């Protein structure tokens, strides 16, 4: 993942490729490193995100339950202060309206959180952006498209870090799959 951006953004949207060991009766096929290149925590923390964050910036970062404490470390390392959960994705099954039941160390996981952190005093545009997102689960780690919700919530410029595709022309994207 070269060519880190060299301009500043008011919104940074990130889905870090966390490296962690998972246990599954189905084997390593559910482990993230079987699907994409993962990064160690120290490498994620050392990315120069501080350099691209505007003085008044929002960070929206996906975090899986077992990595929540690590996600908070990343937020701090990148120069942000945790505020709240920005979005909660309740996963449904692909073929019916029932909720998806995933893995879990204590309880079976269904949701993923997108944490919201700030630097400075960014301005919120709308007060009616819902936190809950109910959408079908897709291929491994693919998140629902929240870009329009984010655009309604705050003004850009916008960047998605660790992006896989470029779905919206008014966003910048960085990652080894774009």
Task: Please provide the spans of the model-predicted regions.
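Class I S-adenosyl-L-methionine-dependent methyltransferase catalytic core
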Residues: 1-178
